[in-house]
Every structure is written in structure tokens, then in C-alpha cells.
A protein has these predicted regions:
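Flexible, low-complexity segments enriched for small/polar residues
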Residues: 1-139
Length: 139
């Protein structure tokens, strides 16, 4: 993963403008009273690069980071059972708090991929979890 991808999402390494990192500490979500500095960078121009970054991480070994989606790996080994896979991802990425409707939608979609294709099932499920709006808001 090159610096270009992190620059594209507005967070170049070692380039934070303040001690608050990249997030404006006083950012309030529009039309609410909710203080949410982490959403100060979220806009229509940053959403696609963030999705691209998630896809890149899922499919490439980068900077010593490798996510193992093979059948022998921690995600792929659960891929034959779409429900078990999504529950496992929900535990890891959402602290076991994945909404039921989100879980159902992901299980249904992942179930369309043949159970014999553990790598595709696992990487698809992980991508759907980490790019969901619920993941961004809750975790």
C-alpha cells in the first residue's frame, strides 16, 4: 500500500496537521448535536477512495500486512457456513453487535458464492462488513 492511497483518503502518513490527528475535534454531524470528529473527513470525495483502500487491503499483501482468506486461514476456514463466517467477522469487527438485518443481508449475499470457494466467500464477507455504514458508525 503506497502513500498515494492514504493521501487519497486525506490521511498521509506523518502528515497530521494537529495533535488531534486528521480529525477536527469540534466537528458536529450536520443537522444533529452529535460531536463526531471521525466524520469530519467523510464526504462524497473520500468515500470511493476508502472503499478502494479496503478492497486493496483485502486482495494484496502490503507493508507486512497480509489478510489470509484461504481455506486454511482464520476466515476461509469458516467460509463453508456463511452464517458462521459472518458471525465471526461480526465478533471481530463489530464486537458482536452486528444488526440482524445487516447479518441477514450479508449471509444471503455470501451464500450466492459457491461454498467450495472459501477465499472469495471470506473476502467478500469481510469487505461487506468493513465497508458498511453500520461498521463506520458503530466501530
Amino acid at each position: 500500500m503506497g502513500n498515494g492511497q492514504l493521501v487519497a483518503i486525506g490521511e498521509p502518513p506523518f502528515g497530521a496537521p494537529t495533535v488531534f490527528n486528521f480529525f477536527p475535534p469540534d466537528y458536529v454531524i450536520p443537522q444533529t448535536t452529535i460531536n463526531a470528529p471521525e466524520f469530519g473527513l467523510e464526504n462524497t470525495g473520500s468515500i470511493i477512495p476508502r472503499l478502494d483502500l479496503a478492497d486493496y487491503i483485502m486482495h494484496n499483501s502490503t507493508g507486512g500486512l497480509f489478510v489470509d482468506f484461504t481455506a486454511a486461514g482464520p476466515f476461509g476456514s469458516k467460509a463453508a457456513d456463511a452464517g458462521a463466517l459472518v458471525d465471526y467477522l461480526g465478533m471481530i469487527f463489530m464486537h458482536g453487535q452486528m444488526p440482524t438485518d445487516m447479518r441477514t443481508a450479508i449471509v444471503d449475499y455470501v451464500s450466492m458464492v459457491p461454498a467450495s470457494d472459501a477465499t472469495d466467500r471470506a473476502s467478500l464477507a469481510a469487505y461487506l462488513v468493513v465497508t458498511s455504514s453500520q461498521y463506520k458508525i458503530m466501530h
